[in-house]
Amino acid sequence: MTISYSGNFFRLLLRWKGSIWRSVWRELFLFLFLFYFIRFSAPHFFNYTDPTDSKGYRKIFKVMCNEFHEYTKMIPLTFLLGFYVSNVVSRWWRQFETLRWPEDFLSILCLLLPSKESRPARHQIARYLNLTSALAWRDVSTKIRLRFPSLRNIIDAGLLTEKEYEKLQDINEPSPGIRWLTPLHWVQQLIDAEITAGRGSVNYVSVATNELKAYRISFRRLYCHDWVCVPLVYTQVAALATYSYFFFCLFGRQDLNHDDFYSLDAFFPLFTVVQFLFFVGWFKVGQDLMRPFGLDDDDFELSYILDRNIVTSFTIVDSLQDDDPPKFEEDVFWKHHNEQQQMHQSMFLPRVPTSLKWGRIDLSRNAHKHPPKLHTYLEMKNQDPEEYKNRKNNKFIAW
């Protein structure tokens, strides 16, 4: 589910669910295990294989560590991860924008079919809109698939009837990819039947058709995002650059000066761990957001959105449409209408220009009708330079 958070800085750092600690703790534990294994096993290995250091294994190891440290400077990790994660995050937000809300179309539907005789049609159309969401989302979302493993589960949820199930099965056999589109076609047929029967307003047909088209396009875009992922080679480049960088850090960040006990790196690679949290956590952001319809902490809560849409849809077409609006009652603004009108008119009365420290400013509401003059074009009354030198008290220009 999507993690919402609020609070101060320190409380956010201690959050576990959906945090960087939960994303990278396994990789960080493996990195520290290998790092300390190399640190403690290398001296014992050299003492066992070359006690007198006649073969120069220690020198070769130091040279290799220094070379690996230089290799880490040659990998443009910041550039690769920045470009990779920015594309993934923008794609992640575009996928969220494909989630269409039914209340826009249903509000227009209430204007198109406002009578009480059209209530069964409105109710059926609202159910078909949510049926389309359930059919489409179960193809791309793991949570919706677990909620509706088969179409029989959709029947148990009340979004589908037995006759409609049989029709969907008959349509799905010759054309498997059109099943989610079928309820939207039924919506068009219901609207056409109501208009033909004279129970609808023809003025809103075009607007309702455009909204229904936008509703259908949103699901098609969602399928396109699910079919076409970020290129695999791009993900491989980002993963290879990240993990190879810290492979070189296993050797390049070793403390080779064993006599310096005052160095922090002699006990714990602090800055290397900070880099690991930044870069691996950065890469994990791209990995987690690449497919936001799974079971991760920050994936979209489509099950909640579907429940919310069902409740909202039936409330609009049944309760709100059949309930008359409240009768007019005098409120505070209506009682003081005359006072507000007088106050409103007084705001447009001309005002006397006010002289301020920084110059004369016209505070009149009609000042925008007279474009201001630039001070560079103002005529000087007296062009004698000696007089202006003596006027030391006048420090500001009159605009």
Swiss-Prot record:
One of its GO terms (molecular function) is chloride channel activity. The chain crosses the membrane at residues 28-48, 74-93, 232-252, 266-286. The keyword Ribonucleoprotein does not apply. It is a multi-pass membrane protein. Its main location: membrane. Pfam families: Bestrophin. GO terms for cellular component: chloride channel complex; plasma membrane. The keyword Metal-binding does not apply. InterPro entries: Bestrophin (IPR000615), Bestrophin-like (IPR021134). It is found in: Cell membrane. Keywords: Cell membrane, Chloride, Chloride channel, Ion channel, Ion transport, Membrane, Transmembrane, Transmembrane helix, Transport. Coiled coil: none annotated. Belongs to the anion channel-forming bestrophin (TC 1.A.46) family. Calcium-sensitive chloride channel subfamily. Forms oligomers. Forms chloride channels. This is Bestrophin homolog 9. It comes from Caenorhabditis elegans. The lineage of its organism: Eukaryota, Metazoa, Ecdysozoa, Nematoda, Chromadorea. The gene is best-9.
